[in-house]
């Protein structure tokens, strides 16, 4: 069993062994510290501290759980829609596994690749590869990437890839993707579960998109919708495969 599979068997409760129980208890203690840190950080942003506002519209695409929820197809879809309307979007990516994500680097311009995957990281490079008419910039500080996009690339709109928890850059629309096959991250924040922050964070969302709905029974999807309606009744929920 791989490390990832073992971790999921523990946090999901599938592993009912004594060691599994001990591991869950230990992870639960760590989760309390993590949740406290996230709450302090979010409270700061709620007050507007440390938030940069730019001169062009910003759309954030993100999630509330660790793991893939289909952000790349959504970012590509939004870019396609915007370019068809004559706009010039630039995608801001953190650049996971980049050679140095402390630097802000233009990795593609108008669909032309400017760096190798070893520089940008595979995930951002593959995203840039499929965006034929958009620009992609990587860097941990999205506000700096935003400045580069606006001042050097002439971007008139920005898309933050994996931006829901990156609150240092103000956004006009927050789109949150929820994986229908594991929507609520085993009900616990990391590392006891897969939630990147408490579910109450969904109140910041403007749009919820349930992804991978074709991988679960219709009854499960309706159950997720019912729970979301109870938590965030005024936020629209859409579905995609």
Question: Where are the language model's segments positioned?
Answer:
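Alpha-helix N-cap/helix-start motif at coil-to-helix transitions, marked by capping-box chemistry
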Residues: 1, 27, 31, 118-121, ...
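Walker A (P-loop) phosphate-binding motif
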Residues: 42-110, 215
């Amino acid at each position: 069993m791989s490390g990832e599979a073992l971790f999921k068997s523990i946090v999901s409760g599938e592993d009912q062994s004594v060691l599994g129980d001990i591991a869950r208890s230990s992870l639960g203690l760590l989760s309390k510290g993590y949740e406290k840190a996230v709450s302090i950080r979010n409270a700061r942003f709620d007050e507007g501290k440390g938030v940069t506002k730019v001169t062009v519209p910003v759309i954030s695409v993100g999630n509330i759980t660790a793991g893939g929820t289909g952000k790349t197809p959504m970012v590509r879809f939004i870019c396609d829609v915007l370019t068809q309307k004559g706009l010039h979007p630039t995608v801001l990516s953190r650049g996971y596994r980049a050679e140095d994500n402390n630097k802000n680097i233009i990795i593609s311009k108008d669909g032309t690749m400017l760096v190798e995957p070893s520089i940008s990281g595979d995930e951002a490079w593959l995203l840039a590869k499929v965006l034929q008419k958009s620009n992609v910039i990587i860097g941990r500080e999205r506000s700096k990437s935003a400045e580069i996009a606006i001042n050097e690339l002439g971007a008139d709109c920005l898309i933050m890839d994996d931006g829901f928890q990156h609150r240092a850059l103000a956004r006009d629309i927050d789109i949150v993707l929820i994986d229908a096959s594991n929507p609520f991250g085993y009900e616990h924040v990391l590392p006891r579960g897969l939630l990147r922050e408490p579910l109450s964070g969904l109140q910041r969302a403007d749009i919820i998109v349930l992804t991978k709905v074709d991988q679960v029974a219709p009854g499960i999807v309706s159950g997720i919708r019912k729970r979301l309606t109870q938590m965030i009744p005024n936020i629209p929920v859409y579905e995609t495969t």
